[in-house]
Amino acid sequence: MTTQVDFWFDPTCPWAWMTSRWILEVEKVRDVKVTFHTMSLYILNEGRDLDPGYRERIDATLVASRAAAAVQKLHGHDVLRDFYTALGTRIHPGGEPVTVETVAAALADCGLEAGIAERVTTDEFDTDLRAYQKVAQDLVGTDVGTPVIRVNGMALFLSLI
């Protein structure tokens, strides 16, 4: 029987990135089906008293999570998986900054419409992003980060540190 793994990620989180690469390797050698879902460190940390430097970094993540939410809404989870790989590869091993330009390049890598990149500077996809975030938070609470992983209905926050 196939094990269903649901994986919530913020595209900018290095811990989620490393864990996502691991679970995709697991999927190659085990009877596992991974479905990726968007979440947002920006939304998770809204209203919290954070160190100013950390707040600045968190605020910069919003364009990436909005882009992922847009892809999830417009194209579904399979395309989101490919977009996360494209964007994550640019950000994490690639060292590219989290910008609209990096989002646009990742969209192009996936053959997706460039117009999405222009829309991530608006709040157009925020309602969707908040709904995706709420699902993750309802599973594990608000005192966690990313990734959130649900395996056959049992959810956890996976911290690598």
Describe each PLM feature range.
Residues 8-10, 90, 121:
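Short strand-loop junctions, especially beta-strand C-caps/beta-turns
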Residues 22-26, 100-161:
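C-terminal cap of thioredoxin/glutaredoxin-like
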Residues 1-23:
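Local sequence-structure signature of Cys/Sec-based thiol-disulfide redox active-site neighborhoods
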Residues 17-103:
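Structural alpha/beta surface segment adjacent to cysteine/selenocysteine redox centers
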